[in-house]
């Protein structure tokens, strides 16, 4: 039976205080609970020692602070780069995957925003089986907290990328609440500039996100410089073609001042030619705003026959962009030996 208790992690601090008032509980206790959840990061209401026993009992009867449970049989650490991939189980039994990537500048957690995905991008494992449902703010937050527990010793998460399973902007309201909670200075206090949200191009929601005027990083899953090619990779492009997507990106930059990153998965003999690199350079230069391109060599997925180009081809593509004054990086492959691409572990376990 699904648990219908109120998840306290679905609430901002203000909402938590309002909830306590409606329940007739002392409002200042809400801040103490917030501290226990995000500073102390406890797993149980019962251990909240500065909360009166009677209130703790009422909280346990009416509320929950655990929105997912770690599947201890599905935690994998890459011996080559330290990437950690783990699966968690939601209250309704649905699996959700999370990835921790280790860098010199800190630990980054890649969280899922949906269980599965409806976008049907042809190169992505997340779309296998479609979308089961959106994740709640608490279910997204618990992935971050679970990552802190999975990390060894005193290590913790420094950066968040919402690039796991699902299209974050399709789960817009829950995403915004998640962002506000993890950014709260009385909680996890992760700065917006340490958070990246990736979208395959839901144009109306990009405009909505621009109006929020958050200082987060926006990444666009572009993967092709023209509609003919992008239509074959991302079905959503038939609804919101590239020119509409890029117009929304310009508005986002004007509102926030934040440079946008364009992600480009390089697929051998499909979108990796020098002519396409030149076309991409022209398209991005015409935006007349700061941009960055993140080239991603295709990470093998069983569901497709795509492969990554040879390193020389990747270098040629990168060099062409750089010669046109486009900032570019090549993402280092991480977690290949632990099903590191989004959706891979969940898809394998579901089978």
From Swiss-Prot:
GO terms for molecular function: 4 iron, 4 sulfur cluster binding; metal ion binding; rRNA (adenine(2503)-C2-)-methyltransferase activity; rRNA binding; tRNA (adenine(37)-C2)-methyltransferase activity; tRNA binding. It holds the Pfam family RlmN_N. [4Fe-4S] cluster binds at residues 117, 121, 124. Its cofactor is [4Fe-4S] cluster. Binds 1 [4Fe-4S] cluster. The cluster is coordinated with 3 cysteines and an exchangeable S-adenosyl-L-methionine. It catalyses: adenosine(2503) in 23S rRNA + 2 reduced [2Fe-2S]-[ferredoxin] + 2 S-adenosyl-L-methionine = 2-methyladenosine(2503) in 23S rRNA + 5'-deoxyadenosine + L-methionine + 2 oxidized [2Fe-2S]-[ferredoxin] + S-adenosyl-L-homocysteine; adenosine(37) in tRNA + 2 reduced [2Fe-2S]-[ferredoxin] + 2 S-adenosyl-L-methionine = 2-methyladenosine(37) in tRNA + 5'-deoxyadenosine + L-methionine + 2 oxidized [2Fe-2S]-[ferredoxin] + S-adenosyl-L-homocysteine. Belongs to the radical SAM superfamily. RlmN family. This is Probable dual-specificity RNA methyltransferase RlmN. It comes from Natranaerobius thermophilus (strain ATCC BAA-1301 / DSM 18059 / JW/NM-WN-LF).
């Amino acid at each position: 039976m699904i648990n219908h208790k109120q998840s306290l992690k679905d609430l901002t601090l203000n909402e938590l205080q309002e909830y306590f008032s409606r329940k007739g509980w002392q409002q200042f206790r809400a801040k103490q609970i917030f501290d226990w959840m995000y500073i102390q990061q406890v797993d149980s209401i019962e251990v909240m020692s500065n909360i009166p026993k009677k209130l703790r009992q009422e909280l346990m009867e009416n509320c929950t602070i655990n929105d997912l449970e770690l599947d201890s049989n599905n935690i994998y650490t890459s011996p080559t780069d330290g990437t950690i991939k783990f699966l968690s189980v939601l209250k309704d039994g649905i699996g959700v995957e999370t990835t921790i990537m280790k860098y010199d500048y800190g630990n980054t957690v890649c969280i899922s925003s949906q269980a599965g995905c409806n976008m049907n991008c042809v190169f992505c494992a997340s779309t296998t089986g479609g979308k089961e449902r959106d994740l709640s703010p608490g279910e997204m937050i618990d992935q971050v907290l679970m990552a802190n527990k999975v990390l060894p010793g005193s290590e913790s998460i420094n950066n968040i990328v919402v690039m796991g399973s699902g299209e974050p902007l399709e789960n817009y309201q829950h995403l915004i609440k998640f962002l506000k909670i993890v950014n709260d200075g009385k909680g996890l206090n992760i700065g917006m500039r340490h958070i990246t949200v990736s979208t395959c191009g839901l144009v109306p929601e990009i405009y909505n996100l621009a109006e929020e005027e958050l200082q987060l990083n926006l990444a666009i899953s572009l993967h092709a410089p023209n509609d003919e090619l992008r239509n074959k990779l991302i079905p959503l492009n038939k609804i919101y073609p590239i020119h509409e997507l890029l117009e929304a990106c310009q508005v986002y930059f004007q509102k926030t001042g934040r440079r946008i990153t364009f992600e480009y998965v390089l697929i051998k003999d499909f979108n990796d030619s020098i002519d396409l690199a030149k076309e991409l350079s022209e398209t991005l230069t015409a935006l007349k705003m700061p941009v960055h391109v993140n080239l991603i060599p295709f990470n093998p997925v069983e569901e497709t026959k795509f492969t990554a180009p040879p390193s020389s081809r990747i270098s040629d593509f990168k060099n062409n962009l750089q010669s046109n004054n486009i900032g570019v990086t090549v993402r280092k492959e991480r977690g290949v030996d632990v099903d590191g691409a989004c959706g891979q572990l969940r898809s394998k376990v579901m089978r």
